From Swiss-Prot:
Inhibited by NSC95397. Binds 1 zinc ion which is not required for enzyme activity. Plants silencing ACR2 show increased sensitivity to arsenate but not arsenite. The active site is at C86 (cysteine persulfide intermediate). Substrate binds at D45, E46, E47, R48, K68, I69, S70, H71, Q90, V91, R92. This is Dual specificity phosphatase Cdc25. One of its GO terms (cellular component) is chloroplast. Disruption phenotype: No visible phenotype under normal growth conditions, but plants show reduced root size when grown in presence of hydroxyurea. No visible phenotype, but decreased accumulation of total arsenic in shoots. No effect on arsenate sensitivity. No effect on the accumulation of arsenate in roots, efflux of arsenite or uptake of arsenate, or the total arsenic accumulation in shoots.
Amino acid sequence: MGRSIFSFFTKKKKMAMARSISYITSTQLLPLHRRPNIAIIDVRDEERNYDGHIAGSLHYASGSFDDKISHLVQNVKDKDTLVFHCALSQVRGPTCARRLVNYLDEKKEDTGIKNIMILERGFNGWEASGKPVCRCAEVPCKGDCA
C-alpha cells in the first residue's frame, strides 16, 4: 500500500525496456543487410582478418567486447536493428548480443535499438550458402567490396 503512482510507472518503464534476442537466416538478411537502419556486428576475433567478412559489418572482437560496448552503442546510434554473428553463432555471437541487452537494460536510456538478432549459422553459414564475402582490409569496412 505504500507504493506511489510514480513507482508503478517507473517499474512499468523498466519492464518495457527489456529486450529480447531473435534469430535471422542468411537468406532473410541478404536483402536487408545494406539498409541504413541495420548494423551487422562481427564478434569474431582474428579469423575476420583472413576469412573475410560481411560487407559493411562492424568489427567488435568478442575478447574485448565488454571494454568497447559503449563505443558500439555510440557507433550505432542511428540504427534500430543489430545483427550479431561469429563463425557459427553458437557461443560468441549470442554471448555478445546478451551482453549488449544487459548493458542497455542497465543504462535504461532509449538508444533507438529495437531489434537485436543473431545470424543463424554465423559467418561460416553465410559464406557456405554462397552469400557475398568481402575481403577488404578497411577498418571499418565501407561495404564497397560486395
